[in-house]
UniProtKB/Swiss-Prot annotation:
Stretch list, region G3: 469-472
Record key words, sorted: Cytoplasm, GTP-binding, Initiation factor, Nucleotide-binding, Protein biosynthesis
InterPro entries linked: EF-G-like_DII, EFTu-like_2, IF2_assoc_dom_bac, IF2_II, IF2_N, P-loop_NTPase, Small_GTP-bd, T_Tr_GTP-bd_dom
Functional note: One of the essential components for the initiation of protein synthesis. Protects formylmethionyl-tRNA from spontaneous hydrolysis and promotes its binding to the 30S ribosomal subunits. Also involved in the hydrolysis of GTP during the formation of the 70S ribosomal complex.
One GO cellular component term noted in the UniProt record for this chain: cytosol
Originating species: Rhizobium etli (strain ATCC 51251 / DSM 11541 / JCM 21823 / NBRC 15573 / CFN 42)
S-S bonds: none
Protein name: Translation initiation factor IF-2
Length: 916
């Protein structure tokens, strides 16, 4: 209790919490007790509520939070709290100049979950009175600022209203002009679009506020000042929370008017519905519809961002089509289908949705994804179902138009004949060609045998003849076949002293398969043992009928050594060419056949080609097999550079990207892109074939290991490098024939060109031997091979190469085990001797018995033991052998189960080395 009525100092006798009594209109900053002697400053605010109707307007005292608590000095004992007494609330001056005295807040019982209210004393201290005075002064200052702000807002709204009316008039004039221009569409649009009617009367809520001056519904003003919006939306720093926390009534009315609906708190009668033509918003309206921080606080959820003009037009067009049941016309397209295509790409080519294609496949019972690959048949079925036509193409179509171009008969002129010289090895083919060319090619060939296809051109009586020399060795079968395919006439060379041989018969078959006429040249008639008539008789057995025997095949007896009758042979060739009437068109793109190909270290890839049609010139782009290139140079058989190569001329072509296969066709194309496309297609085919071949041979690892263990096949890996493609092909074919059921040659890599470091690395990884045929390893490769311990073998003759590989493969064969029967002995008695064990007393009944030989113990015709003899004695002496009819004693190594009546068979084992 207090000491006097004038003294405001509080004093208590016991421990009691000191608080201030909350007032209905207290505003300002007070101190609130936080417990344990802590306090904090709290701003006390007052909120206003809008009355439902003017007649129900009553002053309502908002529930104010508990007043801040001042903690008193702790007393020894707590004191009983006094009953709460109300104090008169301070007067707050409103902007209108009238004081509004709010009634005191009635006491409400505390709820169960509320904290107990602190006890408020009857008197305030001077500090608390000063705080209340300051809060009252600040409230009055904020009220004055609010009054000034509301006056400015009224002026702003008046200016906006004027601008809005001007924009409305301008918009009405513009709509009238647009309506006149769209009279044809206005009727359909007015009938299709739903009429926009006025909203129903809105119920008056407690938030609604009477408006004495309602405004007519109108669109939003065309322009609004951003500074005015910000001033209206942002409260002043000292403004009361009641002003900051609620929207301005004038803004609510403006927003209601801008949306075309009734203002808040007004009851509007429904107007009759009338059609309204949807117009696109102006740029200013569209800009005003954007979401900003200012409009988000003022407009809230009422301000939605507008759509673009194009989206609105599409929406109207879609709605109009749906109203008049307009359907789009189906566009049928020609779909180009390759051999395989993905569903996504197919849908794009049909201009259909991939989802529709997937749905169709699901109806057909196939679950697929857009990225799945389908074949051309299924793609054609899908395209037909969707109403499109199909044009099927193949990857091989890239080769169309480069070969077999039809020529006009008037453009064809006579060309030289292409003659292939064929026959058995060492029958004098190359020597005959040397005699015709007046050159010595045989001296340049290793071993005196031809191992390449040589192409030359000679002239006889002003007419040119192209000769192709083929090897006669059995390994070069493919070369002879290629020579027969690229030729017009075949000269079959048969030695008069050696008659018809296997390769002679093979050459006859190649010529007949190619459909070319044969001229028989019986060579070596200068020898004493020559018998030309014997050769003619043997040729009859192979259906080669010469003229002297009543047939149509020309035959000439020649001698390559003396040059006898060579002119008659050339005349026979020209006569046969005249009968064939060989012609070609030189004024077209060139095409022909690759005779041979090699990788030259100085010149790169070099291909010997035979031009069969057209004229080949430097600078042209050619495709040969799976390689292509631009012709850098043309070199003839004499080493001269040519400006062009007419039909039937053999030339060397420089400039290819790689070495083509011998026998590949070549053709000139118009561009590098076309050449690259054809080359990539052929390379892809080659890879697919190789992969299919390897997968068919290899199988799974488990199957391969099982096969290797069951069959015992051993492999001899090889890396083969040769000078030309044809020689490599011949070597591979010869080595493949060496294989048996137990051992075979596995060619890890083969190619044309010198031996490089990469070949050494490959041989090291695969544990293979390296074979070089007419090539050598460079210095780096030799050093690398020496460091890695890789053996490189060089060969110039295919005979030696095949023989060495055959011998090496024979070493992989397991030796043959051969048993030789020596004799039999019958056990008569079994003795048990100390320190020796059981000894069988036997009689040799057949052959003889040798010490150290293998023995078998046979009981009832069943072998029960196989081993070696430990001792062989006759009487007490060790003997090396016992002949038939004599008795002896025998003991086995590590075996003593011998019985009377058993038979001992003695044999000798020999291991014999096998060869292929």
């Amino acid at each position: 209790m207090t000491d006097s009525n004038d003294d405001k100092t509080l004093s208590v006798t016991g421990k009691k919490t000191l608080t201030l009594k909350p007032s209905g209109m207290s505003q300002g900053t007070v101190r609130q007790d936080m417990g344990r002697g802590r306090t904090k400053a709290v701003v006390v605010e007052t909120r206003k509520r809008r009355p439902m109707r003017p007649e129900d307007e009553k002053p309502i005292t908002p529930a104010t939070p508990a007043a801040p608590v001042r903690a008193a000095e702790p007393a020894p004992a707590p004191a009983q709290a006094r009953p709460q007494q109300s104090t008169p609330a301070p007067r707050i001056h409103q902007p209108g100049g009238q004081a509004n005295q709010r009634p005191q807040q009635s006491y409400q019982p505390p709820r169960a979950n509320d904290r107990p209210r602190p006890v408020v004393l009857n008197h305030l201290s001077p500090e608390e009175m000063d705080a209340r005075r300051r809060a009252l002064a600040e409230s009055q200052a904020r009220d004055a600022q609010d009054a000034i702000r509301r006056a400015e807002e009224e002026k702003r709204r008046a200016a906006e209203e004027a601008v809005r009316k001007a924009a409305e008039a301008e918009e009405a004039a513009r709509r009238a002009v647009e309506e006149a221009a769209r009279q044809a569409e206005a009727a359909a649009a007015a009938a299709a679009e739903p009429a926009v009617t006025a909203p129903a009367p809105a119920p008056v809520t407690a938030e609604a506020r009477p408006n004495t001056s309602p405004r007519p519904a109108a669109p939003a003003p065309a322009a609004r000042r951003p500074d005015a919006d910000g001033a209206a939306a942002r409260p002043a720093p000292g403004a009361p929370a009641a002003v900051r926390g609620r929207r301005n009534d004038g803004d609510d009315d403006d927003r209601g008017a801008s949306r075309g609906g009734p203002a808040r708190g007004r009851v509007v009668r429904p107007e009759p519905a009338k059609p309204v033509t949807t117009r696109p918003k102006t740029d200013e309206e569209r800009r005003r519809g954007k979401l900003t921080i200012t409009t988000a606080d003022v407009d809230g959820e009422d301000a939605g961002r507008s759509r673009s003009l194009s989206a609105m037009r599409r929406r109207q067009e879609k709605f109009r089509r749906s109203q008049v049941q307009e359907t789009r016309e189906k566009i049928s397209r020609e779909v180009v289908l390759p051999e395989t295509i993905t569903i996504q790409e197919l849908s794009q080519r049909m201009s259909e949705r991939a989802v529709d294609v997937i749905k169709y496949l699901m109806k057909e019972g196939q679950m697929m994804k857009p990225g799945d690959v389908i074949d051309a048949d299924l793609a054609e079925l899908i395209a037909g179902e969707f109403g499109h036509t199909v044009k099927r193409v193949s990857e091989s179509d890239v080769e169309l138009g480069i070969f077999n171009i039809a020529d006009v008969e008037g453009d064809r002129v006579s060309r030289p004949p292409v003659v292939t010289i064929m026959g058995h090895v060492d029958h004098g083919k190359t020597s005959l060609l040397d005699a015709i060319r007046h050159a010595n090619v045989v001296a340049g060939e290793a071993g005196g045998i031809t191992q390449h296809i040589g192409a030359y051109q000679v002239e006889q009586n002003g007419q040119k003849i192209t000769f192709i020399d083929t090897p006669g060795h059995a390994a070069f079968t493919a070369m002879r076949a290629r020579g027969a395919q690229a030729t017009d006439i075949a000269i079959l060379v048969v030695a008069a002293d050696d008659s018809v041989m296997p390769q002679t018969i093979e050459s006859i078959n190649h010529a007949k398969a190619a459909g070319v006429p044969i001229i028989v040249a019986i060579n070596k008639i200068d020898k004493h043992e020559a018998d030309p008539q014997k050769v003619r008789n043997q040729l009859l057995q192979h259906e080669v009928f010469v003229e002297s025997m009543g047939g149509e095949t020309l035959d000439v007896e020649v001698s390559a050594k003396t040059g006898k009758n060579l002119d008659k042979l050339l005349e026979a060739v020209l006569l046969q060419a005249e009968i064939l009437d060989l012609k070609a068109n030189p004024n077209r793109t060139a095409e022909g056949t690759v005779i041979e190909a090699q990788l030259d270290r100085g010149r790169g890839a070099v291909a010997t080609v035979l031009v069969q049609n057209g004229t080949l010139k430097p600078g042209q782009i050619i495709v040969a097999g799976d390689v292509w290139g631009r012709v850098r140079a043309l070199v003839n058989d004499k080493g001269e550079h040519m400006k062009e190569a007419p039909p039937a001329m053999p030339v060397e072509v420089l400039g290819l990207s790689g070495t083509p296969q011998a026998g590949d066709k070549f053709a000139v194309v118009e561009s590098e892109s076309r050449a690259r496309e054809i080359s990539e297609y052929r390379q892809r085919l080659a890879r697919d074939k190789a992969a299919a071949r390897q997968s068919g041979q290899r199988g799974s690892l488990e199957q391969m290991m099982t096969q290797m263990q069951s069959t015992g096949i051993k492999e001899f890996p090889l890396v083969i490098k040769g000078d030309v493609q044809g020689s490599i092909e011949a070597i591979a074919g010869a080595l493949e024939k060496l294989g048996t059921d137990e051992v075979r040659a596995r060619i890890v890599h083969l190619g044309a060109g010198g031996i490089t470091e990469s070949d050494i690395s490959l041989a090291e990884a695969s544990n293979a031997a390296i074979i070089g045929f007419n090539v050598r390893a460079n210095a780096q490769a030799r050093q690398f091979a020496e460091r890695q311990g890789i053996e490189i073998r060089y060969y110039n003759i295919i005979y030696d190469l095949v023989d060495d590989v055959k011998a090496a493969m024979s070493g992989l064969l397991s030796p043959e085990r051969r048993e030789t029967f020596i004799g039999n002995a019958e056990i008569l008695e079994v003795f048990n001797i100390t320190k020796v064990g059981k000894v069988a007393g036997c009689r040799v009944v057949e052959g003889k018995v040798e010490r150290g030989a293998g023995v078998r113990l046979i009981r009832n015709d069943v072998v029960v033991h196989e081993g070696k003899l430990k001792t062989l004695k006759r009487f007490k002496d060790e003997v090396s052998e016992v002949p038939m009819g004599q008795e002896c004693g025998m003991a086995f190594e590590n075996y003593e189960d011998m019985r009377v009546g058993d038979v001992i068979e003695c044999f000798r084992v020999e291991h014999i080395t096998r060869t292929l």
